[in-house]
Amino acid sequence: MADSISDLQKDTFYWQRLLRLAGYYHGAIDGIPGNGTRNGTERWSTDADRYKMETGCFDERTERNISTLLPEAQKAARQWFKLARNEAVNQGYEAKIICGTRTYAEQNDLYRQRPKVTNARGGQSWHNFGLAWDFGIFQ
């Protein structure tokens, strides 16, 4: 038996946790993709698509990052970003959502960066739970 789990299992564990947090998955968090995981993923996608239809589509990078958030956070991010983007454009700038959900490993990598970019380690950031996004303003 292997000492570590596969990347697929790690990804599935992570996805099952997010699905459970969003209320779309009630099975065991076991890293095994099954019907419960698939059904939860379909419900997630249905809600995400509905929120996208309500606000319209944004640029590719923003869409990619919004799609990593919990569906209710996607809704909030879309509503907020629509206003922020319009204000940025009115002032001659461009706005993008540059980050959404991060894994614990990604969060720890940011935590170790110098100069310091975050005070949160993996598991301590709202990004790790699909509830936060970062944005950038560009010329």
Segments predicted by a language model, with ranges:
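Charged, low-complexity surface segments at secondary-structure and domain boundaries
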Residues: 1-2, 139
